[in-house]
Amino acid sequence: MSQEDKQRITVEIYNRKYHIVGEESERHMQLVADLVDQKMNEIHEVNKQLDTSSLAVLTAVNTMNDYLKLKEDYATLLGSIKKKED
């Protein structure tokens, strides 16, 4: 996909505007931004003393942890399906 074909949107995450360019639909990119914003606000409610940079890193760590758990669950499910097919 060429640079001209990519979607460009402006989103708000944790009260800051960001310009995002990507290959996904605008709807998808907005959903991602909304989820990041939601996660940052959730973490902020528990850790009000965190500065924005620390909050962003903690959000990334939590998100990757969730991603890895889902990836492991997916692999387990695929393994179960494969065993049933054999």
Swiss-Prot record:
Pfam families found in the cross-reference section: ZapA
Subcellular location, record wording: Cytoplasm
Gene (UniProt): zapA
Keywords, comma-separated and alphabetical: Cell cycle, Cell division, Cytoplasm, Septation
A Gene Ontology BP annotation from the UniProt entry: FtsZ-dependent cytokinesis
Species this chain originates from: Oceanobacillus iheyensis (strain DSM 14371 / CIP 107618 / JCM 11309 / KCTC 3954 / HTE831)
Its job: Activator of cell division through the inhibition of FtsZ GTPase activity, therefore promoting FtsZ assembly into bundles of protofilaments necessary for the formation of the division Z ring. It is recruited early at mid-cell but it is not essential for cell division.
Location (main, coarse): cytoplasm
GO annotations of cellular component type: cell division site; cell septum; cytosol; plasma membrane
Record-given protein name: Cell division protein ZapA
Binding partners and assembly: Homodimer. Interacts with FtsZ.
PANTHER family, per database record: CELL DIVISION PROTEIN ZAPA
Sequence similarity: Belongs to the ZapA family. Type 2 subfamily.
